[in-house]
């Protein structure tokens, strides 16, 4: 019998299946396995969706905190937003997150924050999109192309900032 090093999800599945098989008896093993695996998968997907929601909220909170700090120490808000977006995207890459999705979320939230504090939204968009592209360029050519493409399609006004040809 093969021994595996199980992840937390694997251990949970194993324990749930053992319990289901013992509870239902061996007569209904296949049905118990199907139902248990379905339940574990649904819980896993739900957990992942909650992480994604928390990540989006966290990005918004980070950006609001950065804008607040910039105002408190009289720092350039747009420079702060550009650097914050750049940092978020590079960090996302480091933990294996979807860099394109994170770039869109961070860029949208930063542009929104700029508008809320009375900054020129057009100039903010230019600075923030530039920060996102710089981060993606530093990550690598695949990230660079993906971020440029998704921002062009997702962020109003970014097509004028992102010029072809690119990597």
Which role does the model predict for each range below?
Residues 1-167:
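Extended, low-complexity, charged alpha-helical tracts
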